[in-house]
């Protein structure tokens, strides 16, 4: 009898335990702090601007008519307490590295082990893996060379003509350009490459994505040589009526060797796994 009673009590305690003793601890509610930092530097036409972005956050770069570089950074931090947010704010930010014809905007933060070892040796370890991001907006002289290294987040580039090199980890990237020498590589996401004018001032562009989609928007009457290729799986969809075969194999679902109008600047679009859409866009 005692054995049966003991077993019954154990069973009751077992099923009642979730109400008396919670099986999981409540999640710690993180505080959020947002701040905006804006900096301006004098800068002549024809120089180089480098941005090393945050692991997460958007990047927008616009060309303008001033001899200045303007950097606006919207910084979002998360931490358990205000004191923790103060610690994070001291490291998750950006610094300038400048010389006569080159300005670098360098993101610092908990993602950079070398930086943390060098400048924040006593930083609390519990804060190292907390989420944070920086959304950058840069305005640069229109004739500027660019080097952009982005992480996870949208990228927009417009109104700049120069030598431009862009890399991103995961991004919806929008490039609206009328000239320059462009190289863009994205690991995963979507790249939309738009040319709003019929002529391109410069030698062309090389656009690559490992997995995802490349959209190519060409205006009516555009002139240029267009190549596209799918390396593994996927296809090329061409709905732009102005393309003609330039050399073998011509225009297929896997490879395109084509010419628009009178030809000229050279554009290459490469997808590892995904789709290349060549289509009619707006423009003048």
Question: What is each stretch, according to the model?
Answer:
Residues 2-284:
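Intrinsically disordered, low-complexity terminal regions
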